[in-house]
């Protein structure tokens, strides 16, 4: 289901999009603040207003990650896979942030020394990619390629131009918006985008729950699917069965500010690496 259709369905069920807008944006946390100051060259005293102005423009699309400014909570560097990802990109590997929103995690990589030409970002909404360029004020300098695409569209530029061309796919806070069977399709697509060789890597940051009955109560309103550890492993078992590929899956619980603020009980952030063998 397209996000616009999801929102329309939710509104008809009594959901108020304005409930996602936080009026308590009073500071910009690290590391986003340093990146905006040092990479984007925004004067320190102007950073908060710059972020507020962009957040208000972006809230034309009333998603929680925008209304609550959680796009500022950068997390890629907290993954235990980050040193490997950064090192590989510095050495020439190509990384895609799938469902990248404003491309904020890609700017973390660039700030830490990754060549921007080795980085790709893809999102369903081209407006988000443009807003990212405005947020980080790097339109004249960034060499990364941003592709607006539906990951499940076989004819999209993402699929026709990058299949088999990538080395790492990073997926953060994206899979849960699909039901279980569609998540399998997305996982298989991510594998198709990777070079067909050992070492090709998917790194995920996934909203997970200790009690699936609570976590998936939103199904009455939206077709989200929150994993527990067992269902997450089952997903990748299915992917291996259907593709014939052998994958090494490693999981960990990741300390995460967004999980701590989540309104549902028992929500945590599941980190995972899926490596082709």
Curated annotation (Swiss-Prot):
Record: residues binding S-adenosyl-L-methionine: 123-124, 150-152
Keyword annotations from UniProtKB, A to Z: Methyltransferase, S-adenosyl-L-methionine, Transferase
MF annotations from Gene Ontology: methyltransferase activity
Pathway: Secondary metabolite biosynthesis; terpenoid biosynthesis
Enzyme Commission code: 2.1.3.-
Superkingdom as given in the UniProt entry: Eukaryota
Keyword hit for Transferase: yes
A single GO BP: methylation
Keyword S-adenosyl-L-methionine in annotation: yes
EC supergroup of this enzyme: transferase
UniProt family annotation: Belongs to the class I-like SAM-binding methyltransferase superfamily.
Role: Methyltransferase; part of the gene cluster that mediates the biosynthesis of andrastins, meroterpenoid compounds that exhibit inhibitory activity against ras farnesyltransferase, suggesting that they could be promising leads for antitumor agents. The first step of the pathway is the synthesis of 3,5-dimethylorsellinic acid (DMOA) by the polyketide synthase adrD via condensation of one acetyl-CoA starter unit with 3 malonyl-CoA units and 2 methylations. DMAO is then converted to farnesyl-DMAO by the prenyltransferase adrG.
Subunit structure: Homodimer.
Name under which the protein is recorded: Methyltransferase adrK
């Amino acid at each position: 289901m397209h996000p616009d259709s999801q929102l329309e369905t939710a509104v008809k069920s009594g959901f108020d999009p304005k409930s996602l807008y936080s009026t308590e944006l009073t500071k910009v946390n690290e590391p986003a603040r340093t990146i905006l100051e040092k990479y984007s060259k925004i004067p320190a005293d102007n950073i908060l207003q710059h972020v507020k102005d962009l957040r208000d423009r972006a809230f034309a699309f009333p998603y929680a990650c925008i209304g609550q400014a959680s796009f500022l909570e950068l997390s890629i560097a907290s993954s235990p896979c980050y040193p490997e990802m950064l090192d590989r990109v510095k050495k020439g590997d190509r990384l895609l942030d799938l469902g990248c929103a404003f491309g904020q995690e890609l700017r973390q990589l660039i700030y830490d020394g990754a060549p921007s030409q080795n980085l790709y970002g893809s999102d369903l909404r081209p407006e988000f990619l443009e807003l990212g360029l405005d947020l980080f004020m790097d339109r004249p300098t960034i060499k990364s390629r941003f592709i607006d695409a539906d990951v499940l569209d076989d004819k999209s530029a993402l699929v026709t131009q990058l299949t088999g061309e990538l080395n790492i796919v990073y997926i953060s806070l994206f899979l849960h918006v699909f039901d279980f069977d569609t998540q399998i399709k997305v996982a298989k697509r991510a594998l198709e985008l990777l070079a067909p060789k050992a070492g090709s890597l998917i790194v995920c940051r996934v909203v997970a729950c200790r009690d699936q009955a609570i976590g998936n109560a939103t199904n009455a309103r939206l077709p989200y699917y929150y994993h527990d550890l067992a269902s997450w492993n089952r997903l990748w078992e299915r992917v291996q069965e259907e593709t014939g590929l052998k994958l090494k899956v490693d999981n960990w619980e990741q300390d995460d500010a967004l999980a701590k603020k989540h309104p549902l009980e028992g929500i945590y952030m599941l980190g995972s690496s899926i490596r082709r063998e």
